[in-house]
């Protein structure tokens, strides 16, 4: 404690400063183009992928990026196709955010964030045409493959959609389906015990997110940065660097120059 002109001044360690006034702490860091995890304002976390990590799944992958850890296991089951799509299979993605990955998530029903991300994953699979669903059909009107993609966050630190998608995409690339045929005499599917085939992906799709804090764009925001931000923008590109999807949350409207900048950055990162 120091005394200046008879007035006592308090000094705090960075950790205490962060707890007392998190907004001012983040603003102080960003003015120096640095963040609490050491990245610059425009820097994305590097993703490390380990695939085929679950021996009992048809496909799997675990990704790590900073403090984030997401794992995806894909299980293939056979079901009767829907009446309105008799020659197609389908994919069911689901994200689990449990109290084990962050204290902000509570036991019980899925959190709002988990439900929103799961829905966005499902819509993205449809909009991107990543998988030809007809390739999942075994026999029209009788049998098709259903891919249940369970994505579990083991440790959470922001940008849930980006990393859930990264884990899902990495796992899809490893899927092996048993060679299956429809036996009309037995009226059931016969699967080969050893022969398998991959799921053909039409392109590669990547997701890039930003948040806005104090009029500053934060690439790949952490959990703490998301809590303090007012706007969020996600841009998804395919391997041709064409836009697959744009997700905007918070705020009023996207400034054209801001959107253009984010698109340019995303394309440079692909």
Swiss-Prot record:
Q: Name one Pfam family in it.
A: RNase_PH_C
- GO BP annotations listed: exonucleolytic trimming to generate mature 3'-end of 5.8S rRNA from tricistronic rRNA transcript (SSU-rRNA, 5.8S rRNA, LSU-rRNA); nonfunctional rRNA decay; nuclear mRNA surveillance; nuclear polyadenylation-dependent mRNA catabolic process; nuclear polyadenylation-dependent rRNA catabolic process; nuclear-transcribed mRNA catabolic process, 3'-5' exonucleolytic nonsense-mediated decay; nuclear-transcribed mRNA catabolic process, non-stop decay; rRNA catabolic process
Where found, per UniProt?
Cytoplasm; Nucleus, Nucleolus
GO molecular-function annotation terms? Answer: 3'-5'-RNA exonuclease activity; mRNA 3'-UTR AU-rich region binding
Keyword Nucleus assigned to the entry: answer is: yes
**Record's keyword terms, sorted:** Cytoplasm, Exosome, Nucleus, RNA-binding, rRNA processing
Stored CDD domains: RNase_PH_RRP43 (cd11369)
NAD: present as a keyword of the record?
Answer: no
A cellular component term from Gene Ontology for this protein is: cytosol
Function as written in the Swiss-Prot or TrEMBL entry: Non-catalytic component of the RNA exosome complex which has 3'->5' exoribonuclease activity and participates in a multitude of cellular RNA processing and degradation events. In the nucleus, the RNA exosome complex is involved in proper maturation of stable RNA species such as rRNA, snRNA and snoRNA, in the elimination of RNA processing by-products and non-coding 'pervasive' transcripts, such as antisense RNA species and cryptic unstable transcripts (CUTs), and of mRNAs with processing defects, thereby limiting or excluding their export to the cytoplasm.
Q: Which family does it belong to?
A: Belongs to the RNase PH family.
Which PANTHER family does the record cross-reference, listed alphabetically?
A: EXOSOME COMPLEX COMPONENT RRP43, EXOSOME COMPLEX EXONUCLEASE RIBOSOMAL RNA PROCESSING PROTEIN
Please give the subunit comment from the record: Component of the RNA exosome complex. Specifically part of the catalytically inactive RNA exosome core complex (Exo-9) which may associate with the catalytic subunits rrp66 and dis3 in cytoplasmic- and nuclear-specific RNA exosome complex forms. Exo-9 is formed by a hexameric base ring of RNase PH domain-containing subunits and a cap ring consisting of csl4, rrp4 and rrp40.
In Swiss-Prot or TrEMBL terms, this protein is called Exosome complex component rrp43
Which source organism? Answer: Schizosaccharomyces pombe (strain 972 / ATCC 24843) (Fission yeast)
Q: Which gene encodes it?
A: rrp43
């Amino acid at each position: 404690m120091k005394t200046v002109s008879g007035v006592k001044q308090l000094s705090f360690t960075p950790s205490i400063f962060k707890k007392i006034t998190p907004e001012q702490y983040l603003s102080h860091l960003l003015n120096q183009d640095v963040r609490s995890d050491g990245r610059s304002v425009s820097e994305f976390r590097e993703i490390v992928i380990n695939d085929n990590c679950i021996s009992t799944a048809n496909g799997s992958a675990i990704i790590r990026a900073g403090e984030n850890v997401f794992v995806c296991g894909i299980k293939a089951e056979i079901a009767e196709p829907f009446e309105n799509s008799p020659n197609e299979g389908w994919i069911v993605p689901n994200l689990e955010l449990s109290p084990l990955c962050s204290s902000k998530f509570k036991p019980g029903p899925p959190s709002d964030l988990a439900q929103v991300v799961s829905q966005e994953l499902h819509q993205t699979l449809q909009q991107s045409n990543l998988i030809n669903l007809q390739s999942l059909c075994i026999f029209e009107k009788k049998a098709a493959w259903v891919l249940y993609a369970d994505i579990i966050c083991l440790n959470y630190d922001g940008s849930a959609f980006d990393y859930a998608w990264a884990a899902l995409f990495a796992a899809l690339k490893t899927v092996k389906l048993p060679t299956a045929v429809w036996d009309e005499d037995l009226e059931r599917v016969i699967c080969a015990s050893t022969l398998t085939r991959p799921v053909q992906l039409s392109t590669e799709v990547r997701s890039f997110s930003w948040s806005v804090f104090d009029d500053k764009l934060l690439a790949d925001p952490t959990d703490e940065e998301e809590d303090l931000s007012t706007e969020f923008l996600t841009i998804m590109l395919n391997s041709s660097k064409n836009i697959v999807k744009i997700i905007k949350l918070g705020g009023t409207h996207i400034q054209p120059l801001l959107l253009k900048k984010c698109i340019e950055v995303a394309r440079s990162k692909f």
